Structure formats: C-alpha cells, structure tokens
Amino acid sequence: MELVVTSRETGKKSFLKKIRQQGGIPAVVYSAGKSLANITVDALVFKKFLSNLESGALSSTVFSLSYEGRIIKALVKDIQYQITTYDVIHLDFEELVEDRPVKLNIPIRCINAVDCIGVKLGGSLRQVIRAVRVVCKPKDIVPFLELDVRSVGLSQTRKLSDIKIPAGIETITPLKEVAITVSRR
C-alpha cells in the first residue's frame, strides 16, 4: 500500500488537533526504536484503505511511505482510535531495513472451510488463534499464513505446527498451541 505523507510540526497538542480538523492523522515513523520523522497521513485515504482490508491483515501490511522525495517501507506498529467515533487519531510506523529482522503478527487464514469433513457432519469450526507472532527479515514478510482445514473431522483440532511456515520466518508463538477446532454443535 502506497501512502503520500507530509512532514508536520511537533510540540503542542494544538498542532495535532489542527491536523485532525484538517483531515489528517498525525503519525511518527520509528527506526531502530528512535523517532525518524513526524508525519501526517490523509485520514480519508487511510480510512478507505482500512475499510477494504481483510480483518487482522493490518499487522502484516507493508506500507510504502512517500516522504520528501524518498520511499520508506514501514509497518504499522500502533494505531490509536478516538473512543466514541472509532476514528484513527494517531499512527506509529516502524521502518523496515533490509538486513534487520522485525517482529510482527501474521494472520492465519483457514482455507477449504466449506469442504471441512467435520463441518459437513454437522460440526462447528472455531478458529482459536487468529495470528502468529513471528520474526523475519522484511523481504520474507507474507500477508497471511494458510491452514488447510479440509481433512479436520468432528472433535478434532489442528495446531500451529500444521501450518506450512515459509522459509525465512521464525515463529515466536509456540507451535504446540491449538489453532482451530471442530466441535459438535
């Protein structure tokens, strides 16, 4: 996802309030734990992007931030919402550097759920874990991990170890954890 961002002033809360009133979202880009740039993201563009995004996929979405003539590859590390309207009021991005590993959550997508044996026999498929915490280099980031549930029968489970993890990705979440279960209704 490409975002055109602009530089912003730092300091008082009144600056941030003015940015929000003008249709922007204040944001900070961090690199190696230190603030790299204070920026503004267009609120309408970001809101439209979020509305089209699959649930849980924001954590593994790589953004290309067009900032002062250069492109910064980054992940959203924190997002703050307004309590009553649920509008985004602040973003934290983490810059991706080629040789520096990054920790992130990659969502799990269950495939072939319609063909699941346990569901066809009247069971209910429940996804226990929605994302896996991993560490990998930026070039190895994938948007989601697939778990094939076609062969899962009634009263059976699949663990994280049943997910095919691509090369270059190391899991932090223990692989013995149950990812999905099919139970009787």
Curated annotation (Swiss-Prot):
GO cellular component, one term: cytosolic large ribosomal subunit
GO biological process: translation
Keyword vocabulary terms for this entry: Ribonucleoprotein, Ribosomal protein, RNA-binding, rRNA-binding
CDD domains registered for this protein in UniProt: Ribosomal_L25_TL5_CTC
Keyword Glycoprotein appears in the UniProt entry: no
Pfam families assigned to the protein according to its UniProt record, in alphabetical order: Ribosomal_L25p, Ribosomal_TL5_C
One GO MF term attached to the UniProt entry: structural constituent of ribosome
TM spans (from-to): none
Subunit structure: Part of the 50S ribosomal subunit; part of the 5S rRNA/L5/L18/L25 subcomplex. Contacts the 5S rRNA. Binds to the 5S rRNA independently of L5 and L18.
Family, as annotated: Belongs to the bacterial ribosomal protein bL25 family. CTC subfamily.
Function: This is one of the proteins that binds to the 5S RNA in the ribosome where it forms part of the central protuberance.
HAMAP family registered for this protein in UniProt: Ribosomal_bL25_CTC
Stated name of the protein: Large ribosomal subunit protein bL25
Biological source species: Chlamydia pneumoniae (Chlamydophila pneumoniae)
Biological classification of the source: Bacteria, Pseudomonadati, Chlamydiota, Chlamydiia, Chlamydiales
